[in-house]
Amino acid sequence: MTPQITKIIRYSVQGFKPQYQSKHLKNINYHLNDFNINDFPEHLRYTIQKQHEEHLSFYKEHYQDFQYGIWFFIDGHKNNQSLNHLKYKVPCWEAEIENDVLLYDVNWEYQTTLSDQFGVNSGFYLPASQIHKIHNIKKRKSNKAS
């Protein structure tokens, strides 16, 4: 049986090659190693501690997935304008991804699917272990006005 697929895009010089997530891992490593509840105002500590414990459990369980991976969008929902945090223009790549893929939301707070509305609008994180679910990769031609 042929798997169901969704068209996706990614803005990156490296295309769909998984990248080490050093910037994003800093937050996880903070929760794993450096978190100190006494750094927060006393009236917020109960809530912050509760959130920290929820994140900590999730981060420990999925830490390997967060090491290497890629960020992508569902085709038709984002364009280069949405990437104004990038310092320079990067190429756009397109591909197809199997719908049964294991994904994470962009904030690394939960596992999700391609139908997650937050992900449809904000993008997804795909761990390197799931890269084999991407097919028909090609660089998208620029549609600059002449």
What are these regions (language model features)?
Residues 2-22, 27-39, 43, 50, ...:
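Active-site and NAD+-binding cores of ADP-ribose-processing enzymes
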Residues 34, 45-87:
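Extended catalytic/binding region for NAD+/ADP-ribose chemistry, centered on the ART fold
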